[in-house]
Amino acid sequence: QVARRKDAINDWGSIVALSYIAAQRTLYGYNDMADAKALLESIARSFGYIYGREKHVRINTVSQSPTPTTAGNGVLGLKDLMEFAESMSPLGNASANDCADYVLTLFSDLTRKVTMQNLFHDGGFSSMGMSRRAMRTYEKGLRFEDVHEHQFPFGTGDNKEE
């Protein structure tokens, strides 16, 4: 809003803010930052409409892979989260430099009609349910009793007393 009041951005300019998937999905350890990122994404949509109509300024957010930044390092279990995202993402985690390159495209004329979007830059993590690599890791961490006990949660049907 300050940029708008001071008329600091040219027509067809672009504003990009960094977000994270925890704004939309629960991720252990992200806590209050998830709420802040959700608010940021909402502001980008709401204010994107206003600034877009007035000066064709585009406002977007980018949800980046977990990245060891100053803020990111404050997240409980960041290393584990990075390892999990790496195992889930078909293309692997995007680095901070990869993200910077991507954001540059959002400042270019190549994306003149992209606005009010949260764009994922996470190697495909946001679209995954479970990868084979993550499933293998998960299975190795289970005890046989855990698997056997929960394999037939409603009984096997073999025992008449079940």
Where do the language-model regions lie?
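Generic structural signal for alpha-helix termini and adjacent loop/cap motifs
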Residues: 1, 5, 50, 108-112, ...
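Catalytic loop of short-chain dehydrogenase/reductase
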Residues: 4-53, 64-68, 92, 125
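C-terminal helical subdomain
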Residues: 61, 79-114, 119-123, 143-162
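Intrinsically disordered, low-complexity Ser/Thr- and acidic-rich flexible linkers and loops
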Residues: 7-9, 138-144
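Short beta-loop-alpha junction of Rossmann-like oxidoreductase domains
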Residues: 65-77, 130
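Short, small/polar-rich loop/turn modules that mediate ligand/substrate recognition or access, typified
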Residues: 12, 53-58, 114-116
